[in-house]
């Protein structure tokens, strides 16, 4: 049994030696039979025509397989585009998808720039460094697009206290008038109508001016009096409590305790009698005495 390269098994009995032939004719007959069987198998398979679509594997590998496949793919893609219509997507040329290996010319750098889209000059998109060049584009010069000119803010004015519009100006008293008013205020803080009329005429002032001056002076005296009282209260409070450094003894308290203790210790008890030690009274005042830092100075 002989194994052929095409996978066809041929028995030796089928291809026996002919009666009048030699041994060299057997291999040639077997090869012819195998070739005929291979041709029949290839004829039985359906033949698939190569696809000429631009995205197919056949079109992509056309350069490596056949030298004329590239031209046929280009022609087929151009015919399909012509039959489909003349509308083409932006930036796509005929045959560019069918032949990706074809070199494409690079587009200029400013093709997709903002200046190319708006069709504006390049100097209009760049801010001028010198004051001679215009700082805004021509279409912004119109009052519709140009912003209003910036206003220079002046420094804020000092806000004064608002007074009434019909407010009378402050009366400028002279030194002699002020001395006379102060002397009269020390004598009497409240003036009667007759006294006020007489006093105002002597100073060449109106009764209203004298009345207002006395009102303001009484308010000032009240403020000064309250401040003096506050100072006295603060001065009356000691810096440290007197119990920290002072000693206070009640009248007769320690003396009575010491006398009782001496009488019990040295009293007449036993063979030897001793006189009790006199204890000087410590309480010299009728009230508590505090010896603090104020009394030691």
From Swiss-Prot:
Glycyl lysine isopeptide (Lys-Gly) (interchain with G-Cter in SUMO) crosslink location in chain? 9, 127
Task: Report the family membership.
Answer: Belongs to the Msh homeobox family.
Disordered: annotated span:
1-50, 66-108, 129-157
Highest taxon of source: Eukaryota
The organism of origin for this protein = Daubentonia madagascariensis (Aye-aye)
| GO MF annotation terms | DNA-binding transcription factor activity, RNA polymerase II-specific; RNA polymerase II transcription regulatory region sequence-specific DNA binding; transcription cis-regulatory region binding
Protein name in UniProt: Homeobox protein MSX-1
Q: Which UniProt keywords apply?
A: Developmental protein, DNA-binding, Homeobox, Isopeptide bond, Nucleus, Repressor, Transcription, Transcription regulation, Ubl conjugation
The subunit structure is: Interacts with CREBBP/CBP, TBP and SP1; interaction with these transcription activators may inhibit autoinactivation. Interacts (via C-terminus) with PIAS1 (via N-terminus); the interaction is required for the localization of both proteins to the nuclear periphery and specific binding of MSX1 to the core enhancer region in target gene promoters. Interacts with H1-5.
This protein's encoding gene: MSX1
Q: From the record, give the transmembrane residue ranges.
A: none
